[in-house]
């Protein structure tokens, strides 16, 4: 991922240095496990643990000759050791190291992402509670429907991110898995105890069955889950973009002193952060196809997935980490124009209360079809003439003979739409 959309902590996880360090840790743990089984002298393992060092530049120099990164790595590490170097990579195949270390690196990335999600959820919780009863216009098909509250909108985002967190925790169990089962997964030259020891010490699980590789359905599920998190962010970002339109202006991204919105138009205050999140989400989601196409490897392995994953996994995790942090800050600092929200409710001449009038007529004994056919023409006339809907209703004796002034007052009371907000919040776990 380019530096522009990378945060240092996450980017450092995907450096060559950290990758080789993870490989080295797997190699050393394997030696320790062999030693526990009495196969490698403990003194040799101690020397390996103390003296083995990673030199990325040297490993890459060797790779120019070997054309094999793991062989180059093991030879570079061996250069830092004495006779004990013969135990490095003992009984292992390259992917025992690469796949297990990759899962360990992904685990490091996951710990950051999980904290990112939890922080965003906390901000959404605060926003939901702060604007619990702030009335605003609910829209369906982009058209005014009925009032809701900005707090309910935030509660919706909150519950969606809680689901994302649950899914993320589930996929962590699938992806944070190692394998050290040899060339075709049969443990022909390495006992299962080695795998168990290494994975236990890395804090990851073991694959119950593997080939030379971990199966890539795990990685496809992982990428799809991260893409769904990103897509939720895009959904929220698009809502902010729509609510910041000049004609609506119910919210606005924070605009810093000295910030510029346009090189040509000095007045511009654009939702560039939310637009940025929209674009990043597209990039992340685009990797789903790559992840799924990595699943059908040949027989017990090929490396067609390798080149794709070297690009895909850093890109997706780094981009999502960036997006989560940036969008959390956007929502946290969001300006909310409560007066505009209330004013927008009145822009459609009271038409948004048409269902309340319809239901009131039905409750007083009118057949639904008759009630609908009496209310709709008044609604259409209000649309076309910009006449207040209630004014037209009050001129129709077939309606006023059924509904009293007090009953009409209740029909046109926007506060009615707050009646179940407490229930919604309770169901969302936002008490």
Swiss-Prot record:
Q: Which GO terms describe its biological process?
A: 'de novo' AMP biosynthetic process; 'de novo' IMP biosynthetic process
Residues annotated as binding N(6)-(1,2-dicarboxyethyl)-AMP are 4-5, 67-69, 93-94, 212, 263, 268-270, 276, 307-311
Question: What reaction(s) does this enzyme catalyze?
Answer: N(6)-(1,2-dicarboxyethyl)-AMP = fumarate + AMP; (2S)-2-[5-amino-1-(5-phospho-beta-D-ribosyl)imidazole-4-carboxamido]succinate = 5-amino-1-(5-phospho-beta-D-ribosyl)imidazole-4-carboxamide + fumarate
Q: Domain of life here?
A: Bacteria
Cite the SUPFAM superfamilies for this sequence: L-aspartase-like
According to the UniProt entry, what is the EC number of this protein? 4.3.2.2
Record GO cellular component, one term: cytosol
Q: What class of enzyme is it?
A: lyase
Q: Name one Pfam family in it.
A: Lyase_1
Please give the subunit comment from the record. Homodimer and homotetramer. Residues from neighboring subunits contribute catalytic and substrate-binding residues to each active site.
What is stated as this protein's family in its record? Belongs to the lyase 1 family. Adenylosuccinate lyase subfamily.
Question: Any idea what this protein is called?
Answer: Adenylosuccinate lyase
What's the source species for this entry?
Staphylococcus haemolyticus (strain JCSC1435)
The encoding gene is: purB
């Amino acid at each position: 991922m380019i530096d522009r959309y990378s945060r240092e902590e996450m980017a450092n996880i995907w450096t060559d240095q950290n990758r080789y360090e993870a490989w080295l840790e797997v190699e050393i743990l394997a030696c320790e496990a062999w030693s526990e089984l009495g196969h490698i002298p403990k003194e040799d393992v101690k020397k390996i643990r103390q003296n083995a060092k990673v030199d990325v530049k040297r490993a890459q120099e060797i790779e120019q000759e070997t054309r094999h990164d793991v062989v180059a790595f093991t030879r570079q590490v061996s250069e830092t050791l004495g006779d004990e170097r013969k135990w490095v990579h003992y009984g292992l195949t390259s992917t025992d190291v690469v796949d297990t270390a990759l899962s360990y690196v992904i685990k490091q990335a996951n710990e950051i992402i999980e904290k990112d999600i939890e922080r965003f959820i906390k901000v959404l919780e605060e926003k939901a509670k702060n604007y619990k009863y702030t009335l605003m216009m609910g829209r369906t098909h982009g058209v005014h429907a009925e009032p809701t509250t900005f707090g309910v909108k935030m509660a919706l985002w909150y519950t969606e991110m809680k689901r994302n967190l649950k899914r993320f925790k589930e996929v962590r169990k699938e992806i944070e898995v190692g394998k050290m089962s040899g060339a075709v997964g049969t443990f022909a030259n390495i006992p299962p105890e080695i795998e168990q020891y290494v994975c236990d010490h890395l804090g990851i699980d073991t694959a119950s069955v593997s080939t030379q590789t971990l199966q890539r359905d795990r990685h496809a599920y992982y990428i799809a889950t991260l893409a769904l998190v990103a897509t939720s962010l895009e959904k929220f970002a698009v809502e902010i973009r729509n609510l910041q339109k000049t004609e609506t202006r119910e919210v606005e991204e924070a605009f810093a002193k000295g910030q510029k919105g346009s090189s040509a138009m000095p007045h511009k205050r654009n939702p560039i952060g939310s637009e940025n999140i929209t674009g990043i989400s597209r990039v992340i989601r685009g990797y789903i196809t790559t992840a799924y196409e990595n699943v059908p490897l040949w027989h017990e392995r090929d490396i067609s997935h390798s080149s794709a994953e070297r690009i895909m996994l850093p890109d997706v995790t780094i981009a999502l980490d960036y997006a989560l942090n940036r969008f959390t800050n956007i929502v946290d600092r969001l300006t909310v124009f409560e007066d505009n929200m209330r004013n927008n409710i009145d822009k459609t001449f009271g038409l948004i209360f048409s269902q309340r009038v319809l239901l009131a007529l039905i409750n007083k004994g009118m057949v639904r079809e008759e009630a609908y056919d009496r209310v709709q023409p008044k609604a259409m006339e209000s649309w076309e003439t910009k006449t207040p809907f209630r004014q037209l209703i009050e001129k129709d004796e077939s309606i006023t003979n059924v509904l009293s002034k007090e009953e009409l007052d209740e029909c046109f009371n926007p506060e009615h739409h707050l009646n179940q907000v407490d229930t919604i919040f309770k169901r969302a776990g936002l008490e």
